[in-house]
Every structure is written in C-alpha cells, then in structure tokens.
Amino acid sequence: HHLKTLAEAYGLTGNLTYAQKAIEELSDWIDHVHAPSLYDEQGNLAPLHFDGLSPWRALEVGIRGYRTWPLIIELLADTPCFTEEFQQKLYQSVQLHCKILYEISPLLWPKADHNHYLMENLGLMALSCLFPEMPDSAKYLSHSQQELDRCMEAQCTPCGGQIEGSPSY
C-alpha cells in the first residue's frame, strides 16, 4: 500500500515527485503483474486462481478497489502525471478488477459469511461508483449492494457486532 502513501505525500506537500512515482509504479504494476485466467482449462470459472497468496487474491483485488486506488485517483487525477494513456490503462485494469470481484468472489464465499467477501464487495461498489461509465457499472453496483446486505445478515450478531469479534470489522 505504499502507493497510497506516495499519493498522500503528494496531497500533503504538493511535491510532484511523489505523484510521478506513484503513477509510474502503478503503471508498471499494471503492465507486469498479470491476473490469472478467470477460467480453467475446461472453460469454467476458476475461483481457486484467486484464493492463494498472490497480488490477485480476491481480497487484494477488493482492497485495491475501495482502499487504495480510489484515493490515488482522488489525489492524483488533476496532476500532469495522470495522463490520458495512464487513465486508459487504469480503466482497463479497473474493468478487470470488477469482473473478478463480480464473477469470482461469490464462488469463493457463497454464504457471504467472511470478512474477505465484505471487503471484496466494498471494492466492487467503490469502483462501480468511481467509474459509472463502465458498461457493467450499474450491474456491479446493484450486485455489490445485494451482497453487502447478505454480508450484514451473515456476519453481524443480533446486537450489531461482527461475528469474528474484531473491533475493526
């Protein structure tokens, strides 16, 4: 999450060096850290491709969607570093992130009973709101709202606590 820190440093100082480095590294990450296939060799969705420790674990995809990338966009979108070329690259990656969260996450957490699923749907919701021009944005937003409701039902106790008992949840 150091890219978030770089964006925040730019936001606090106005020093374009931080903005440039954040954009440069995010662009490089998009170019070189490729997502696994959503499908297995038989053409079926492959949720296990997104369940191991990797930058493309569904949880990481969701966290980028609600915690990291929206802040980077908010703080850096008006800088000269946020070029049209970078915007297009980011937009394509956001579409892939949304597709993973929409298609894969429900297969990983069919009962909506895990905090990972909550964060994955927060990511889908945030990205669909941030990019309403995406062709499937309305579908993603509706799905994330429905699934967050399911998360509340499955993960909250009658008194409002989270079932894992963690105050941060």
Predicted segments — roles?
Residues 1-169:
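Aromatic-lined, polymer-binding surfaces characteristic
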